[in-house]
Swiss-Prot record:
<dbReference type="InterPro" id="IPR050206">
    <property type="entry name" value="FtsK/SpoIIIE/SftA"/>
</dbReference>
<dbReference type="Pfam" id="PF13491">
    <property type="entry name" value="FtsK_4TM"/>
</dbReference>
<dbReference type="Pfam" id="PF09397">
    <property type="entry name" value="FtsK_gamma"/>
</dbReference>
<dbReference type="InterPro" id="IPR036390">
    <property type="entry name" value="WH_DNA-bd_sf"/>
</dbReference>
<dbReference type="GO" id="GO:0051301">
    <property type="term" value="P:cell division"/>
</dbReference>
<dbReference type="InterPro" id="IPR018541">
    <property type="entry name" value="Ftsk_gamma"/>
</dbReference>
<keyword id="KW-0132">Cell division</keyword>
<feature type="binding site">
    <location>
        <begin position="535"/>
        <end position="540"/>
    </location>
    <ligand>
        <name>ATP</name>
    </ligand>
</feature>
<comment type="similarity">
    <text>Belongs to the FtsK/SpoIIIE/SftA family.</text>
</comment>
<dbReference type="InterPro" id="IPR036388">
    <property type="entry name" value="WH-like_DNA-bd_sf"/>
</dbReference>
<dbReference type="InterPro" id="IPR027417">
    <property type="entry name" value="P-loop_NTPase"/>
</dbReference>
<dbReference type="Pfam" id="PF17854">
    <property type="entry name" value="FtsK_alpha"/>
</dbReference>
<feature type="transmembrane region" description="Helical">
    <location>
        <begin position="141"/>
        <end position="161"/>
    </location>
</feature>
<feature type="transmembrane region" description="Helical">
    <location>
        <begin position="164"/>
        <end position="184"/>
    </location>
</feature>
<dbReference type="Pfam" id="PF01580">
    <property type="entry name" value="FtsK_SpoIIIE"/>
</dbReference>
<keyword id="KW-0131">Cell cycle</keyword>
<feature type="compositionally biased region" description="Gly residues">
    <location>
        <begin position="806"/>
        <end position="817"/>
    </location>
</feature>
Amino acid sequence: MRSGASAPLAMTDTGHGIQAFARRQVGRLVGAGMFLAVAFGVASLATWNVADPSFSHATNNTVTNAMGYAGAVFSDLAMQFFGLAAVAALVPAVIWGYLLFSARGVDRLPKRGLFWFGFALLAAAIAGCIVPPKTWPLPTGLGGVFGDMVLKIPGVLIGGYPTGLIASVLAVLLAGPTLWLFAFGSALIGRKNGFAVMEEPAAADPREDDLLFDNEEDEGDEGILALGAITHWWLSLRAWMHRRAVRRRQERDEYEPEMEPRASAWRRAAERVESAEFAEQRMSPGGRARVEPEFFAAMVNDRSVSVDPDDDDIFDRDDEDMDFDDEPVAQRRAAPAAKVQQFRSDAATRVEAPAPRPAPGARVQREAQTSLIGSDKFEMPSLHFLSEPKNVARDPSLSKDALEQNARLLEGVLEDFGVKGEIIAVRPGPVVTLYELEPAPGIKSSRVIGLSDDIARSMSAIACRVAVVPGRNAIGIELPNAKRETVYLREIMASRDFETTKAKLALALGKTINGEAVIVDIAKMPHVLVAGTTGSGKSVAINTMILSLLYRLTPQECRLIMIDPKMLELSVYDGIPHLLTPVVTDPKKAVVALKWTVREMEDRYRKMSKVGVRNIDGFNARVQLAEKKGEKISRTVQTGFDRQTGEAIYETEDLDLEPMPYIVVIIDEMADLMMVAGKDIEGAVQRLAQMARAAGIHVIMATQRPSVDVITGTIKANFPTRISFQVTSKIDSRTILGEQGAEQLLGMGDMLYMAGGGRIQRVHGPFVSDDEVEKIVGHLKLQGVPEYLDAITEDDDEDDDEPSGKGAGSGGGGGGNFEDSDDPYDQAVAVVLRDGKASTSYIQRRLGIGYNRAASIIEKMEKEGIVGPANHAGKREILVPTEDDKF
């Protein structure tokens, strides 16, 4: 006998006697052991629970398997690798056990074991062709990992996982080889005497060995011939189908004109639809598509099989059924689109529904009922002054099927540029639709962001903005809708969110991509920098911010200072009671107004320090509480020391304070102001931006020239909240936001809102017309006359802080001209009485004299009783009335 052959396990030529008896008993023991092993496997598989602890599932749950932890591990491994075919894989073990227990034996163990394993693989593949039910808990198919591995091979040939009719045909084709492998692996065929009891020969016959050798070769040749015949039949069938596809394409080209430029993208979309139908049918209970094993993922994903969208039915038709003359060309062109639209029609899980319209608040119902009783109080503007949103029919391009189709097409475009990934969510909105891309491992975000122009061109879109979604492993691709919806200010003003917001200075900014209302608080920002080109919606956004304040706050709660060098945008608000001064149009007076605002900020801080509060809200609450109780706010201050005892002298000072309103400074065009007085403007804006928040003073600054000479680094550092409308270049976008993206906006109110911390959000600003603004302004003018402060634009204190030196200019007030007096002492007394400051260094700076002479003058003033002695801090009290005290 040749060395490669294996003798039967229990029937070897050992002769009669004790040795043969022992071999038979060992065979029976092995057969009984196989019966027990099969019983263990069947019981384990019958009580298999995916939640049991195993090698692939670490948990502290109690084992529910009938065979304990060992049964849970075995059943989990068997179901993971073979699926339902694990039960069929145990059948050959039963037959082996029967043959061994009955002393018939199993010859050629290695070969039959290999065929047994092959039978298990094909059985798993046949099980994988069956569509799993929704309750199937594993990410693989019914054939397990091995079944999916085998199905990957025909999947490469046909361009996707076998589904439907193809899967049925493939299962039938695999049935023959599977039965043959089962029969040979189970020792049902290829045995010398079948199931007959083999009699032990009396002596070894050399001719019998030769006969067995020949039989083995014949059996091996039969197996090879069978496999060769099956392979030849399969290749012939595939070649026939390929020839039919080529012939159909040639016949279609004779009647159909040249395909559109986007036909290649449609073909790729149809190909992905074909390959995804199998995944669509295999959905787990949680709604997530099954995850295919990674063994052949690279092989399938990297394939370059060209699938024509009209070749879907080549396996179902004969040549006689194909009549291109009777079928219109338009219908054949529409076939890919129809198939893509039909895909996921029932389970479009990644397409989210748009946000509902904001719920109306109670104010709408109150204003709907006209009051017959007049009121002397300040009456807020009515919502009826604003235009109602129009009930526009929903854009059909935003249906689930259309959005799913666009998502598939976008995946194809990204794949063309070498970006692999999956669109995991689609969020439609009033203006744009957000497609969230989950890139494959190794794909850089910067690479995808740099493809924004190419994506817009390939998708036939006006613009495309690409940005990373914060806090998620996704990249957002924003594409404009075919039909843009208009966001109306009334829709946000009348919403319950705007009415019930706790924001002190609420601004109706617009809507997000999903259609949700965006309401921000300028008191927390605390300042806003707005930039954008002409026509981008910047001025309309300024109007919506102003109207947001006018609809919620009275003149006692909020006052406005408007600076409009263009003399067009904000002049319509001139005369409303909320203004502290008429709309400033002169750039020089704008500088004076900003300096007054700085002085007002400092004065407010002095008042708050006297009361002992830290912000305007605490100050107003303290004053209102005192008014409610009928008390006066007072404080105890140290006025000096007793000359005899040296003890400190304290006095009680009554403070006559009133609640302070918020002040919002609105600068419509910063570029014009920077051209006239850049340093003064920048210094005043810097001080306001750094310190004015606690004083209740906030700045809204807009510019249409977002360059570095207008938006300097100092201004950017103190304006953490910025809004960018459409700009002309990436450089301008980086100047405003620190990153690109604003150049891809659509204009007409489309903006990027960057809150503190660098979080950027795309917002669609509401629209308000000039007629609506004029109606609201006309109503406000009827409520009262504005109380202007002339000091805001008066330039009488411009040179107060400049050192005069010798021959300095006029000091203003009652100080007169120092050059008119030759005595420095008289000049020093005039300075002290006018400015209320008495110190050696101050006199030295104001008169331009030396330190020793200034010290002598201060000592002379002390002797004459004009100033008091210096305290522990070096400050002196002025004992005679100053000019401020006279008035």
